[in-house]
UniProtKB/Swiss-Prot annotation:
Reported function: One of the primary rRNA binding proteins, it binds specifically to the 5'-end of 16S ribosomal RNA.
Gene that specifies this protein: rpsQ
This protein's record includes keyword Acyltransferase: no
Taxonomic source organism: Ehrlichia canis (strain Jake)
Name of the protein: Small ribosomal subunit protein uS17
Gene3D superfamilies in UniProt: Nucleic acid-binding proteins (2.40.50.140)
Length: 83
């Protein structure tokens, strides 16, 4: 059976990360870390990825922990917004 989607729920991804750069206006860089198991050696390894995120009101500072959500493309590299 298919589950019906509740009204107001979105299927956009939400990630949590740390702000690492705030040099540009209305733009921040967020580093998202996750733990994955290495395919061959079976050791748990920390993977990191940086996302360019739209910060409409320039509220975020370096070191802040923020939640980001997928969004339609805002520029060539920005596809995430701060929630």
């Amino acid at each position: 059976m298919k589950e019906k989607k509740r009204k107001g729920m979105s299927n956009k991804k939400v990630l949590t990360g740390v702000v690492v750069a705030t040099k540009c206006d209305k733009t921040i860089k967020v580093m998202v870390s996750r733990m994955v198991r290495h395919k061959t050696y079976k050791k748990i390894v920390k993977k990191r990825k940086n996302y360019v995120v739209h910060d409409e009101y320039n509220k975020c500072k370096c070191g802040d922990v923020v939640k980001i959500q997928e969004h339609i493309p805002i520029s060539a590299t920005k596809r995430w917004i701060v929630i």
